[in-house]
Amino acid sequence: IYANELVLDRRTKGLAPGTIAVLEDGERKPVGLVGVTPASKIAGRMLERDTEIEIGRDWLVAKLTRALELRERLFATPYYRLVHAEADGLPGVIIDRFGDTCVVQPNAAWAEALLPELTEALAEVTGVVNILKNAGSRGRQLEGLDDADAVLLGAAPEAPLPVEMNGATYMADLTGGQKTGLFYDQRPNHAFAARLAQGQRVLDVFSHVGGFALAALA
């Protein structure tokens, strides 16, 4: 919810980033619960329509459980984007899974404020033993958040991890690579490009881990 679509009084503007608040319409009727970042152009992120629900560990467990059930229907192995922000009911949050390791990008202030609860819920739902925080997103800067990466649970891998996608094996650098280490969101595009590339010569420019090139070769 953009700031120019809201009436923000002095008290609202003084809320700490990440505060959970009730959003009301022009008639002061509750619309839902939002994570507030008063100084950002995205001043509120809708979390829940039911204003009686507590946004905490149990709520996060429910959201993550639903996301996991969907991924397990779609993927045979635990290498995928587990949470894709608003699409999974967790606005501003990206979670990529690499076997027993997850990389979390809490790109919204509300998620940063609930990071301990999110870490516990993620470990409980998925059973992963390593959880890393990637704070390199530009979105965090817009939320007024720091850029400090961290190990939230377990340990960081000492070397890039092999990930099989579209018939090719990619090496995902979870601590030194771009974003979370691999562009899971490009998986369908890699597969589409591979079909177009059959029997052709392909140039993959600015390829990072070789997403399109390796898919074309496979």
Predicted regions and their residues:
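A glycine-rich, Thr/Ser-enriched phosphate-binding loop motif common to dinucleotide/cofactor-binding enzymes
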Residues: Y184-P188
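Conserved hydrophobic/aromatic pocket- or pore-lining residues that grip, position, or stack substrates
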Residues: D100, Y170, N189, F206
